[in-house]
């Protein structure tokens, strides 16, 4: 979302999701984006701009355009804000689908990182997850933009204390392991 936003608005991100909120979700494009094999993988999983970058999006747009050229009545070009709205929906749909599939008893979702500041995305998550309370980590005393730093601080503390920093059921490791190294300078 950030790369698309920067290309079309000159802003580094869609502040509050206001730009995405002005667009319309393109369901056919959304389905095309969901064909990415990463989305079908079971957790734990993580990705970012290493996979979901502008060239990936542009390829999906080209593929969808080629398919639409032969179909009457379907637009073959997109308003940039419609693509942004579709990317926000992709994010919300994927999170909601994985949560329902792999953690169906979830009643509360705490969002952190940049998405926690995107009101449009937060609203889409809430709509995609009826019965689940969607809020930010801030409501629980942890600023959303500090969660990653706190996680690394926790890992450092575990290392210093000689405690395992992994969960084998999550990481796939053969057992608990002390993570990291100390290189005094």
Residue ranges of each PLM-predicted region?
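A contiguous, well-structured pocket-lining segment that forms one wall/lid of small-molecule binding clefts
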Residues: 11-13, 17-108, 119-132
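Generic, ordered loop/turn and secondary-structure boundary motif
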Residues: 1-2, 14, 20, 40, ...
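Phosphate-binding/catalytic loop of phosphoryl-transfer enzymes
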Residues: 1-14, 178
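Catalytic phosphate/nucleotide-handling subdomain of diverse soluble enzymes
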Residues: 3-9, 93-173
């Amino acid at each position: 979302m950030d790369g698309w936003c920067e290309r079309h608005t000159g802003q580094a991100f869609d502040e509050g999701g206001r730009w995405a909120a002005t667009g319309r979700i393109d369901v056919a494009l959304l389905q095309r984006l969901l064909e990415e094999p990463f989305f079908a993988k079971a957790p734990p999983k993580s990705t970012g701009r290493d996979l979901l970058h502008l060239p990936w999006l542009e390829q999906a747009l080209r593929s969808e355009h080629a398919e639409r050229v032969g179909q009457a009545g379907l637009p073959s070009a997109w308003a940039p804000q419609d693509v942004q709205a579709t990317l926000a929906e992709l994010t919300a749909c994927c999170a909601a689908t994985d949560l329902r599939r792999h953690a169906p008893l979830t009643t509360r979702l705490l969002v952190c990182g940049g998405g926690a500041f995107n009101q449009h995305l937060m609203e889409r998550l809430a709509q995609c997850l009826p019965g689940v309370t969607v809020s930010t980590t801030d409501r629980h005393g942890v600023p959303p933009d500090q969660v990653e730093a706190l996680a690394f601080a926790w890992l450092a503390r575990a290392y210093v204390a000689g405690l395992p920093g992994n969960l084998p059921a999550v990481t796939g490791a053969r057992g608990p392991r002390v993570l990291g190294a100390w290189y005094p300078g």
